[in-house]
Amino acid sequence: MSKGSSKHTVRINQTWYIVSFILGLSLFAGVLLSTIYYVLSPIQEQAATFDRNKQMLLAAHILDFKGRFQIQEKKEWVPATFDKKTQLLEVATKKVSEVSYPELELYAERFVRPLLTDAQGKVFSFEEKNLNPIEFFEKYQESPPCQQSPLPFYVILENTSRTENMSGADVAKDLSTVQALIFPISGFGLWGPIHGYLGVKNDGDTVLGTAWYQQGETPGLGANITNPEWQEQFYGKKIFLQDSSGTTNFATTDLGLEVVKGSVRTTLGDSPKALSAIDGISGATLTCNGVTEAYVQSLACYRQLLINFSNLTHEKKTGE
């Protein structure tokens, strides 16, 4: 072996060379990962927003469990498409595919409005309170339910040309244009926080659906709260508990939805309480208890708003 080769070998084995190599490799890896994060971050945020909006519209029954638009026609839910010309949902005349990101964004822009309410059920727009909806909802999610004022919620406007361009302030002044309400639901499952939505008809009592966009429950057990087969039983349930005679005192009755252990029919039969109960998930009792508590705690502060919508619906029916 030549002297030059020996010197080169010694150089490679020197500590400073090894340290320099490791530092250089670490720097390269750090720059590479930072670049990848910078490039992918907007895409990830867009995907998260798309999923959250889908879950919201699923809870409001605007989307079916296959992610397709649907519309109520003669008291039946039928497939629908978002007509680019009329900017409205129309009964589908051919096979409907899953909603795309642009379609969902366009529908949300036209017919979904974030609003605020207080303990008296008065409704405000975010513009009136000079608040940013995105920042406010993020902050609200991090707080215990009902610990923040004012309270946020969403509304789905009626599928008409009259409502598509209404601002939040316009809607707050004319709640008769509201088709459905969507409430943020937060609580704790077995393994951590759970966050989702509950959709309610404009009668302030009848459930349209539920969806969870964040949960870390056990796959095959507690995670089944995101299973369509479990979620579909929420449709038509009542969030205000009826008494034994079948009447509802909205001001004093219990408010929420109870996930029972076992089946509703076996546990409650045909009693009025069954209208506000959901079948439990086998092997996921603690998750189900957390879900029940999430509905009770999250909805409690919206009681007066729900009562106001119930009264509004009654007035509309009386005036017809």
UniProtKB/Swiss-Prot annotation:
Catalytic activity: a ubiquinone + n Na(+)(in) + NADH + H(+) = a ubiquinol + n Na(+)(out) + NAD(+)
Chief place where the protein resides: membrane
InterPro entries, sorted: FMN-bd, NqrC
Location of FMN phosphoryl threonine modifications: T285
Pfam families found in the cross-reference section: FMN_bind
Enzyme Commission number: 7.2.1.1
Localisation: Cell inner membrane
GO cellular component, one term: plasma membrane
Transmembrane segments: 16-36
Protein name in the entry: Na(+)-translocating NADH-quinone reductase subunit C
Originating species: Chlamydia pneumoniae (Chlamydophila pneumoniae)
Gene that this polypeptide is encoded by: nqrC
